[in-house]
Amino acid sequence: MFFRPAWYRPASRQVEDTDQINFWAYDSLMHLSAPSDTSLGAHAARIGVFGGTFDPPHIGHLVTAINVRFELNLDRVLMVVANEPWQKVGSRRLSSAADRFAMVQAAVSAEEGIEASDVELQRGGPSYTVDTLANLHAVQPNCELFLILGGDAAAGLESWERPEELAKLCRIIVVDRPGVVSEVPSDFSVERVSVPRLEVSSTDLRARAATHAPLQHLVPEPVISLISQLGLYGDAQ
């Protein structure tokens, strides 16, 4: 029998009639709950949005999320798991969205202010960031959203779905590689944040997992346990 750790919560089923959702009560949709009178005070919540395939999530992802939260004084950072990453369709076989979400839950289980979000799993279909940002604003209308991107992704923003709308919904936070300053389209409000850079990639980690090479200190321990329990990456995907 497969043992599910205490922090594991599978993505909820897709809700068909979204007009009837009580967004504050249905916390699993956005992994956001209504702020209490004292939790965030009177200021608008400052929320980082860090999307990715996270196949698997690794230490580099956490270092980015934690340090951006610190540098920008964010209330929280949501690690948003892509349901169907449109930029990677056909490139390789992905782990299931539910498994990837479970791994992100495991990765952030001990991290204050860093949360797993299944908003894109709940919505279903291709994962377009502009839709995710609009969903988050619907849940918490007064929040400020900060979209966290690597330099390469930021440089290609004009090719994303509805870039003009996206530009109105968030501030772009660019995390560049050392010595590299990526050009970002001028239509976007941009801030650059420097974080410690680790030479870790999900591609390499999948290959290591397939050969049973050690993942310690590259992947959070709860994620390593889950990879083993779920039997992921046995064929290097």
Residue ranges of predicted features:
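Extreme N-terminal basic, low-complexity initiation segments
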Residues: M1-R9, R13
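Nucleotidyltransferase catalytic core that binds NTPs
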Residues: Y8, D19-Q237
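Short Gly/Ser/Thr- and charged-rich N-terminal loops/segments
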Residues: R13-Q14, H58
